[in-house]
Structure formats: C-alpha cells, structure tokens
Regions:
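Conserved C-terminal guanine-recognition region of P-loop GTPase G domains, centered on the G4
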Residues: 22-28, 51-122
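Active-site glycine-centered loops adjacent to acidic/histidine catalytic or metal-binding residues
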Residues: 35, 96, 125
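Conserved G1/Walker A P-loop phosphate-binding module
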Residues: 1-47, 57-64, 86
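Extended helical scaffolds that flank P-loop GTPase cores
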Residues: 118, 145, 149-203
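Canonical P-loop GTPase G-domain recognition
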Residues: 99-156
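Helical mechanochemical/support elements of P-loop NTPase systems and associated helical scaffolds
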Residues: 13-17, 29-32, 44, 48-51, ...
C-alpha cells in the first residue's frame, strides 16, 4: 500500500494471516507501518478480530491508525470505524478503491463525514498510488496535532444504552483492572454490555 512491499496483503478478512511490517519515509518522517489482518469489526469471534484487538489493546498502542475502508462498501466498513472511535485511537481513514465508487456514478461527500466523526478521510487508489502522499501528509498533521478536522466524539447509542455505559464506567473506575490505562474505559464498558467474555476475564 505504501512501503512498496510485494507481499500478499489485502484489506479483506483472511488475506493477511499475521502482521506485516514495512518502513515508509516522507517529508522527513519515518513511518513504521504494521499491516494487521483485514477485519470488519473488533469483536472476539474470529482469529483476525482477536488478533487486531489484542494488537491495539495489549501491545504498544500505535501513534496513528490508518483505517483502510472500501469506498464501494461503506456501510459494512464503517462499523469498524465506530469501534475505533469508541477505543479513542488517533485515526486517519483511507477511502480506498475510490475509483470504483466513481465508476459506479456515485458521489460521496467524505469531507462532511470527516467533520462529523472528527477524523480525516483521504480518497486513495492503492493499485495506482493515488492519494498515498496526501494520506501520509494527513497522518503527519494528526500526529503533530495540526489537523483542523480532528476532534473527540462519542458515538451516541441512545439514552438507555448510554446510561448503562455510564454505570459500567463508574464500576470499572472503582475496581483494580488488569487492562492498560491507555484503553478507553468507554470501550471496555461497551464490550461488557455486549457480554464480551475476553474483556470480562481481564477486568
């Protein structure tokens, strides 16, 4: 996608078996890129989902997550985006395969969505390299806290669920937790509401 490696790596579930690493340089910055398995969510139901979640939660949290989503399948891909927002990670979205969206005659106001979710969105075409330079320029801006789009938001799940999330967050703060402090307590609360057994076992 960026480092020029010719490994069999993709954005789709099951294509990447484990993490691949590459190095990319731009504008005086050196990026260590870790390509995690393709997944549509951060649940614990598949090996890919569990691997990605553990990497984000238990390993050293990345400075920036580049969330590569398929421009032709937005609804399915944006579910993962909402979960990353719940995790409160720094993120830039690569709206990949943007040419397929245009070929279908569709238009997408990605700049308005970016402002709504507080996260930069950059159209890309990985097979041609279109948008890659701009993508990493936005990564630099987010890292340097200079991107005007970035803001902290919560996905509102409705009054009933929000009350449950708030109650669980208060309970988490009252007990000793094995989870790193860098992990969003809101994210943990949502996972506990989902009866996520792996999270339950770690709190």
């Amino acid at each position: 996608f960026a480092s020029g490696a010719h490994e069999h790596v993709g954005n789709y579930s099951g294509v990447t078996v484990d993490a691949k690493e590459g190095v990319f340089k731009q504008n005086g910055y050196t990026f260590r890129i870790v390509d995690l398995p393709g997944t549509y969510s951060l649940s614990a139901y598949t090996p890919e989902e569990l691997y990605v979640r553990k990497h984000l939660n238990e390993n050293q949290q990345p400075d920036i997550v580049i969330n590569v989503i398929d421009a032709s399948n937005l609804e399915r891909n944006l579910y993962l985006t909402t979960q990353l927002i719940d995790m409160d990670v720094q993120m830039v979205i690569a709206l990949n395969m943007y040419d397929e969206l245009e070929k279908a005659g569709n238009k997408f106001d990605y700049e308005s969505l970016a402002r709504m979710i507080g996260c930069p969105i950059v159209p890309t075409i990985s097979k041609t390299g279109f948008g890659i330079e701009e993508l990493f320029n936005r990564v630099i801006k987010v890292y340097e806290e200079e991107d005007p789009v970035v803001r902290h938001i919560h996905i509102n799940y409705g009054d009933i669920l929000e009350k449950g999330i708030a109650n669980i967050k208060r309970s988490i703060h009252k007990v000793d937790s094995n989870m790193p402090k860098s992990i969003s307590r809101r994210y943990l609360s949502i996972k506990l509401l989902e009866n996520d057994q792996e999270i339950e076992s770690q709190i």
